[in-house]
Amino acid sequence: MKDIATPNRTKDIVEKYGFSFKKSLGQNFLIDTNVLNRIVDHAEIGSESGAIEIGPGIGALTEQLAKRAKKVVAFEIDQRLLPILDETLAPYGNVTVINKDVLKADVHEVFSEQFEEGQDVMVVANLPYYITTPILFKLLEEKLPVRGFVVMMQKEVGDRLAAKPGTKEYGSLSIAIQYYTEVETVMTVPRTVFVPQPNVDSAIIRLLKRPKPVVEVTDETFFFEVVRASFAQRRKTLMNNLSNNLNGFPKDKELLDRILTEVGIDPKRRGETLSIEEFATLSNALVLHKLS
């Protein structure tokens, strides 16, 4: 049987079931097996590994994962795809398709039901563009015991995840993802290898979870509030952004100026110039004056 991810086989499956693509679900099917193999290779899936997929579509990536992994669990929100997946994944007895929105699912419950304790598990997915960041944050914040993620996403979002201080892509998203994971851009994927063709190019990004966050912070929630406030208006200085946007902190510019100076950060700098280490130092100093 030919791989699913070829133009002809994809076309045949779509026509056979009279499937119409829903733009609202970000449905773009990959038709290049080489790209799929790069995704699976970088996930380093072995014969004892597990994989979680989100948005399997007609099963193109699922099929490649099933050939290598011990167990594959795929979350698919679109009921119309279930009979198609029943057919395309019939040769593989190690795949479970769950008809749920991953953002609303109890992922810990699914994880404990489907995988063995201590099993090596990766999240491997061609993520729907419109919910890429909510999915990543849900799985990171809920501390799902996975080794990491190899995910395809809009190139622009991938650039933001991997961005360094001082670049226009760098922002609160870069810091939040790099706080939890090591980020690597595997490759750029042209829009031409999808059906239907999206308006933008994609990128494959690998995120490997750190054993512990990259910096030590006294109050994690407050740390992220400081980061978000610092980027509230990109053209404004740290001083302006923090005095106007940091909730739970006294509206006292003199105090703010003193703390910034004490930790060696010029109040006139902009948020995009600070490293994650500087944000941690700043947050740990500011939290001492937080309003209770």
Swiss-Prot record:
Listed InterPro entries: KsgA/Erm, rRNA_Ade_diMease-like_C, rRNA_Ade_Mease_Trfase_CS, rRNA_Ade_methylase_Trfase_N, rRNA_adenine_dimethylase, SAM-dependent_MTases_sf
GO molecular function annotations of the record: 16S rRNA (adenine(1518)-N(6)/adenine(1519)-N(6))-dimethyltransferase activity; RNA binding
Signal sequence extent: none
Domain of life: Bacteria
SMART domains assigned: rADc
Biological role stated in the UniProt entry: Specifically dimethylates two adjacent adenosines (A1518 and A1519) in the loop of a conserved hairpin near the 3'-end of 16S rRNA in the 30S particle. May play a critical role in biogenesis of 30S subunits.
Pfam families, A to Z: RrnaAD (PF00398)
Subcellular location per the Swiss-Prot or TrEMBL entry: Cytoplasm
Chief localization: cytoplasm
NCBIfam families associated with the record: ksgA
Family affiliation: Belongs to the class I-like SAM-binding methyltransferase superfamily. rRNA adenine N(6)-methyltransferase family. RsmA subfamily.
GO cellular component: cytosol
Protein name per UniProt: Ribosomal RNA small subunit methyltransferase A
Enzyme class: transferase
Sites where the protein binds S-adenosyl-L-methionine: N28, L30, G55, E76, D101, N126
EC nos: 2.1.1.182
Keywords: Cytoplasm, Methyltransferase, RNA-binding, rRNA processing, S-adenosyl-L-methionine, Transferase
